[in-house]
């Protein structure tokens, strides 16, 4: 099992089973790994902005993260606009970006760039995985970050040698519950504020706009005579 296969296995273990891709040569080992796992659905997109926009839309509909695969810094740059939108919408995405092999970066090839610097403004979490032995752990951390409520952009940078060198099976990796529960005290504060208001108004956003939650909010609004 190479590093790329280790990462795909980790994604599946973390219930990330869709990858919207626009790869290049640096990502071929990961592309091959995607094809080896039947449970992983790999969707080729003809433009990076399509891949990142599709991942955003997937989260908004399914409320669970998908992954993306982009080619180096320029490929990431082409997908920035929809990563920006996804971050503003609190969509969870595991954003995988290929990188040159670590010992090749110093040669400053035409597509060499500061991928971490490009990714940081549109990501909640950014990490370059520098060893094929660590990619499963780094991938699990990316999934964990993407699942933090209500959703986050986790950018994992995958150098070529991290992908092709021998990796580890993600057997011992565990995923913790990353949901943020609202305390009873905050709920009570909200109730008291609604009771005290002369013309109460409830403003909602994010996951509160899902149908099941809007039904609950409508009942609260009716009970409290809210707008």
Describe every region a protein language model picked out.
Residues 1-227:
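N-terminal alpha/beta PP-like core and its mobile active-site loop of ThDP/TPP-dependent enzymes
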